[in-house]
Amino acid sequence: MKRPLAYITAAWCGDPDTDMELAARYCRMAYEAGFSPICPILYLPLFINDAIPEEHKNGIDMRRDMLRRSHVLVVCGDEVDEDVKNDIAVAKRLNITATTLDLSLIHI
């Protein structure tokens, strides 16, 4: 069975350990729901240095490209920041379905 791609977004807190743990849990939930999750925060920081302006821009471009290839945008968490708003706007413009996760299912 081919799983549709689900782009995972959230207003990440900025603490790498916390963000990675939450992202992995969100991805697991999307996987269990039948999707192939795509979550750039899980791997882009491994090779993109956001302190370098060109790399920061390239990271944004890569995230947008991944979102464009996705079938659904999954918005996670209770907060919405500018990155999440931008993801929602891109998804809307491209007619990509957007949904949220039931956060009561996440156990921290």
Annotate the PLM regions.
Residues 99-101:
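Short acidic-hydrophobic, aromatic-tinged amphipathic segments that line or gate anion-handling sites
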Residues 18-96:
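Acidic/glycine-enriched connector segments
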Residues 8-9, 76:
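Short hydrophobic segments within beta-strands
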Residues 66, 103-104:
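Short, highly charged low-complexity linear segments
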Residues 106-108:
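Conserved small/polar residues in nucleotide/adenosyl-binding loops
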Residues 2-6:
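Extreme N-terminal starter segment of soluble prokaryotic enzymes
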